[in-house]
Every structure is written in structure tokens, then in C-alpha cells.
Amino acid sequence: MMESAISKPLVSIIVPVYNAERYIKRCVDSLRGQTLQNIEIILVDDGSKDNSGCLCDEFAQQDSKIHVIHKQNAGQGLARNDGLNIAKGRYVLFIDSDDFIEPDTCEKLSDRMEREQADL
């Protein structure tokens, strides 16, 4: 069965997470609050020693757009690659777990990419 274009996210947001218990809620809240609704959020728990992994699971239970990968610590680069392996979006945006973005960030970026027919 082919996935319809309607159900396929336009933007995949990948967030490598490592010991970000103090910051991850603000980050995820900023992603969940995007004006562009056609997104998926991939949280890659890179073997956190704090409560980050549990928080990621809680976010995924609250929102079907959020997917979580748990893995042994291997660094941010490999965590990003693991997120890319499951990303379904036409465009990919990487956000660090201690960052947050404005509500219209994904909408503005994707509008520009579509308008300019950007080929990356």
C-alpha cells in the first residue's frame, strides 16, 4: 500500500537528545506549536543518563506526530543519521534539544523552498 501524499509530512524535524531534561520540554513545545501542521518530530534519545528518554516517550504518547528512537550513546552525528533513516518528510530540519524555534519557522522555510523549487 502506497502512502498518500496527504499523510506524508512536508517537514521532518530531527532532534538529537542527550541529557536534555532541563531543556527538552521547551524545545518540543516550540515544535508542537508550529503553524505548519504537516510535520513530524523525531526525537533521538542518544543514551541519556537523565530523564530525557522518559520525557520523549511522554511527548510521543501525547502527540502522534512525535516519534522516538532510543539508542546507545554514539554522538550527535549518528543520532541525526538515525533520525534521517526514518524521516518521511520532503524537507528535513535539525534542531538541537536545547534550542527552540518561532511558531512560523517551518511554514516560512517550507513556503520559500516550495516557491523557489529548491533542490537540495
PLM regions: where:
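Nucleotide-sugar donor-binding/catalytic module of glycosyltransferases
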Residues: 1-120
